[in-house]
Regions:
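Hinge/lid segment of periplasmic solute-binding proteins
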Residues: 127-143
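Sec/Tat signal peptide C-region and signal peptidase I cleavage site
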Residues: 26-32
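Short, Lys/Arg-enriched N-terminal segments with co-localized hydrophobic residues
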Residues: 1-8, 29
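N-terminal secretory/targeting leader peptides
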Residues: 18, 22, 33-122, 139-142, ...
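Bacterial N-terminal signal peptides that target proteins for export
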Residues: 9-19
Length: 344
């Protein structure tokens, strides 16, 4: 049997042990670091699912000491056009970036790959390594480290309209058209089409209320923004290759990041690139998406003619040169590097 004194001592030791355990848990929780990963793409986009897998792989490798948490659909309230402003300052630890959205602050970025100027997978694959190198160099100028890439499918861009089918550039001249990039505004304007940039998140309302009559958008992603609810007709206009999305981290943060964390992110990023840098099934996915839209009520019309398609491609190719010259700085040299990679 234990004496009263021994009982008291046992209780003291037990309480001390519990206290130390609790303190240890608190210190462990306090030392665990969470990186917020800003993703401006809707949660329903295929790329978002790929980013979720990337996050899962990083977290599994790190075992909880540092973890990533993905915030999709712009849920953190950070405009994607402001990425070069908020990311270097540490508003979030990590963010998805797309060069074509960043032309206001970095004009050279938006003219590296102008959509519509590269129309085949074979040609695009020649340019990808050069495009990645350019992005890494340019983002570094903004104190952002490029730590990963997400390939964008070879897309087929179509014209979705509210009230009547549009299958020619001539008919499009009588409509107000929603686009998403300045090069598109300039190209369509040169063809006599009234085009305006409307952000993806505002497109549904703009179509529903008649702010625009038609919207330029890939059929593959139309369901993610419920475009079939505000459109009755659609027709394919042109194929489109895009520079990849970039996963960015403040250069200062990345420099200070533990090598173990860097290695986990880099390895998962390489897996992400390998998974997404595949284009063989893109056209079939496009056809499947069109069939699904037809089931949901869209009338899918004949394609725009080859003549109209070439008219647009010629226009946007000229705009590419003009935008690069206007941007100045490294932009003309970037364009020349891409053209050289393409063999043009």
């Amino acid at each position: 049997m234990c004496s009263a004194g021994e009982n008291i001592m046992n209780k003291i030791f037990k309480n001390v042990a519990i206290g130390l355990t609790g303190a240890s848990l608190i210190m462990t929780a306090a030392s665990a670091e969470e990186w917020r990963f800003n993703n401006f793409l809707p949660e329903t986009r295929p790329e978002s699912a790929q980013l979720e897998q990337f996050v899962t792989e990083v977290n599994a490798a790190l075992g909880g000491e540092t973890s990533l948490k993905l915030y999709s659909g712009g849920s953190l309230g950070l405009p994607n056009t402001d990425t070069l402003r908020f990311l270097p300052k540490g508003a979030v630890e990590m963010s998805l970036m797309w060069a074509n959205y960043l032309g206001r602050d970095a004009p050279a970025l938006s003219s590296v790959v102008v959509q519509g100027t590269i129309g085949s997978i074979a040609e695009f694959e020649k340019a990808i390594p050069t495009v990645r190198d350019i992005y890494e160099e340019e983002f570094a100028e903004w104190d952002v480290a490029s730590v990963g890439y997400v390939a964008i499918p070879m897309l087929s861009v179509s014209v979705f309209c509210r009230e009547e089918p549009v299958r020619t550039i001539a008919d499009l001249k009588t409509k107000k058209l929603r686009v998403w990039a300045r090069d598109q505004v300039e190209a369509f304007t040169s063809l006599g089409v009234a085009a305006q940039i409307i952000p993806q998140e505002e497109m549904y309302v703009a179509m529903k209320t008649g702010v625009v009559d038609c919207a330029l958008y890939p059929a593959l992603y139309a369901h993610t923004v419920s475009l079939q609810e505000v459109s009755k007709y659609a027709s394919f206009l042109y194929p489109m290759a895009s520079g990849p999305y970039v996963i960015g981290v403040s250069a200062d943060r990345w420099e200070k990041t533990d090598d173990t964390v860097k290695a986990a992110i880099s390895e998962a990023a390489e897996d992400l690139w390998v998974r997404t840098n595949q284009y063989e099934a893109d056209y079939q996915r496009e056809l499947d998406a069109r069939d699904k839209l037809v089931e949901q009520g869209i009338v899918w019309g004949e394609d725009f003619s080859d003549e109209d398609r070439q008219m647009f491609v010629s226009s946007v190719t000229e705009i590419w040169a003009e935008l690069a010259e206007e941007a100045g700085g490294n932009a003309p040299a970037y364009r020349e590097r891409v053209l050289e990679a393409l063999g043009r």
